[in-house]
Amino acid sequence: MGKRCPCGTGLTYGECCYRFHSGEWVAPTAEALMRSRFTAFAVGNSQYLLDTWDPETRPSELGLDMGIDFYRLDILETTGGGPFDSTGTVKFQAFYKGLASGVQEEDSTFRKVNGAWVYSTGDVD
């Protein structure tokens, strides 16, 4: 918990995304949810990923490739997704290494369901 959070805020995991993962906090914006979901990939928390996935697009199960290490997130653009919005998009780059190394760029769409931000869909470049 004392290590720097993978989402890139500069805070420790315990001060940052762990609070979302533990249920102590709920993401106030689409970008905050994106950061917490990236960190969930980085720490292997598939349950959080499923819990924050839009019920209309959520898979029944999610298998994470533990051979991939997600180590850096760059937020490129955010549209909407604020506390008073109902939808938003976040364009980001996720850097990874492992059996293969590279960067995945994605435009993700988020919406609020019962007042909470959820991930709906993503277009991978």
Swiss-Prot record:
InterPro entries: NTF2-like_dom_sf (IPR032710), SEC_C_motif (IPR004027), UPF0225 (IPR023006), YchJ-like_M (IPR048469). Pfam families: SEC-C, YchJ_M-like. Disulfide bonds: none annotated. Belongs to the UPF0225 family. This is UPF0225 protein Cgl1438/cg1626. It comes from Corynebacterium glutamicum (strain ATCC 13032 / DSM 20300 / JCM 1318 / BCRC 11384 / CCUG 27702 / LMG 3730 / NBRC 12168 / NCIMB 10025 / NRRL B-2784 / 534).
